[in-house]
Curated annotation (Swiss-Prot):
Gene name tied to this protein: tsf
Organism the protein comes from: Cereibacter sphaeroides (strain ATCC 17023 / DSM 158 / JCM 6121 / CCUG 31486 / LMG 2827 / NBRC 12203 / NCIMB 8253 / ATH 2.4.1.) (Rhodobacter sphaeroides)
CDD domains: UBA_EF-Ts (cd14275)
Cited InterPro entries: EF-Ts_dimer_sf, Transl_elong_EFTs/EF1B, Transl_elong_EFTs/EF1B_dimer, Transl_elong_Ts_CS, UBA-like_sf
TM annotation in the entry: none
Main location: cytoplasm
Annotated family: Belongs to the EF-Ts family.
GO cellular component: cytoplasm
Protein name: Elongation factor Ts
UniProt subcellular location: Cytoplasm
Length: 298
């Protein structure tokens, strides 16, 4: 497979690797981007890739809490200009409040909003503003108490990142602090039990290969038993601590894990939602000359 400059650029952006290292990784893996990331990591040339986070779409995430229930809704637009539009913001707020009454995105589209369905309201707003919009997803969470936080707030309850945290027990403010922590650290899951097993296994494979290659290149190689029973488990323990919410060091007090901070506050964190605008979406790229030609032809 031909390795293009764009492929090298994307790999460098996602891993922080040097240009020649990125090119070699893609060559060695026949252009497979995921395999190239793993190849770089086994060579110690890239950090662990967090869950897919390339953000290219515009829009807003809305969050809303009612008692022990919280919802997050993402609505995408084509441009950030529209995301700053008061009518668009009002629409997203309305969709978010409507989400409290339903359990999934299809039910939300059919939900009533001032005598019209959410879907009808969306289509009418598209016609007025003149830009395509998408009601992309919603998430709902519940507990004894739920706290919400928005990062890069555009208005009350609206922003580029929305977080919900559900706790068991009487919340004394810790849930909001944890929500802010989640916005910053982007954990993969609540606990080890909630992690995707394929993600854990992939990490184990990378760490095993890396440890074996480092040991083979060492002037004083360690016995295989040390690699298998000490080094690899130690690295996996670190991976789990860094990528699970309960295992992470609490940003507000790094002397405690999030689990320990919650316990001290007398609550148990039972779930969270972190929703970022455009997560996993790529904007359609168009050649500039083709774009100009298209504009002139139109």
């Amino acid at each position: 497979m031909a390795i293009t400059a764009q492929m090298v650029k994307e790999l460098r952006e996602s891993t922080g690797a040097g240009m020649m290292d990125a090119k070699k990784a893609l060559t060695e893996t026949d252009g497979d981007m995921e395999a190239a990331v793993d190849w770089l990591r086994t060579k110690g040339l890239a950090k662990a890739a967090k869950k897919a986070g390339r953000t290219a779409a515009e829009g807003l995430v809305g969050v809303c809490v009612d008692g022990g229930t919280g919802v997050a809704v993402e609505v995408n637009s084509e441009t950030d200009f529209v995301a700053k539009n008061a009518d668009f913001q009002s629409m997203v707020t309305g969709f978010t409040k409507a989400a409290l009454t339903v359990d999934d995105i299809e039910a939300l589209k059919a939900a009533d909003m001032g005598g019209k369905t959410v879907e009808t309201t969306l289509q009418e707003t598209i016609a007025v503003i003149g830009e395509n919009m998408t009601l992309r997803r919603m998430a709902k969470i519940s507990g004894d108490s739920v706290a919400a936080y928005v990062h890069n707030a555009a208005a009350d309850g609206l922003g580029k990142i929305g977080v919900l945290v559900a706790v068991k027990g009487a919340d004394n403010g810790i849930a909001k602090q944890v929500a802010m922590h989640i916005a910053a650290t982007n954990p993969m899951a609540l606990s080890e039990a909630d992690l995707d097993p394929t993600v854990v296994e992939r990490e184990r494979t990378v760490q095993t290969q890396k440890a074996l290659e480092e040991n083979a290149a060492s002037a004083k190689p360690k016995p295989d038993a040390v690699i298998e029973n000490n080094i690899i488990p130690g690295r996996m323990k670190k991976f789990l601590e860094e990528n699970t919410l309960l295992g992470q060091k609490f940003v507000i007090n790094p002397d405690l894990t999030v689990a320990e901070a919650a316990k001290q506050a007398g609550v148990e964190i039972v779930g969270f939602v972190r929703m970022a605008v455009g997560e996993g979406i790529e904007k359609e790229k168009e050649d500039f000359a083709a774009e100009v030609a298209k504009t002139l032809a139109g």
